[in-house]
């Protein structure tokens, strides 16, 4: 597993599981309140997750996973990056 910095594999796998599941629900949800709840859950998780992993996923972008207007794009990017880190 090539994850760059010394990020524990379980942190990558756990984050992938959460983000992948939330992305699938968010992508197909037609409920604005459900989508808002998902944004809140993911942002809260991101604030407490492994800081090195967050930095790698954010790739220097301020407000990564925290802004409503870019949330879907950010979450897709995070899931894609996590998938590549696990292979």
Please identify what each model-predicted range represents.
Residues 2-5, 83-87:
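Short acidic DE-rich linear segments
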Residues 2-39:
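N-terminal acidic leader/helix
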Residues 6-7, 12, 44-47, 59, ...:
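Intrinsic disorder/low-complexity segments
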Residues 16, 68, 72-75, 79:
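Long amphipathic alpha-helices with heptad-repeat character
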Residues 23, 27, 46-50, 79, ...:
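A structural signal for well-ordered alpha-helices, especially hydrophobic packing surfaces
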Residues 31-72:
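Acidic, low-complexity, intrinsically disordered interaction modules
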């Amino acid at each position: 597993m090539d994850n760059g910095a010394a990020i524990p594999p379980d942190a990558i796998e756990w984050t992938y599981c959460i983000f992948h599941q939330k992305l699938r629900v968010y992508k197909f949800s037609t409920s604005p309140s459900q989508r808002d709840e998902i944004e809140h859950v993911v942002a809260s998780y991101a604030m407490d997750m492994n800081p090195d992993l967050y930095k790698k996923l954010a790739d220097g972008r301020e407000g990564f996973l925290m802004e409503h207007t870019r949330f879907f794009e950010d979450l897709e990017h995070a899931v894609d990056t996590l998938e590549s880190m696990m292979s």
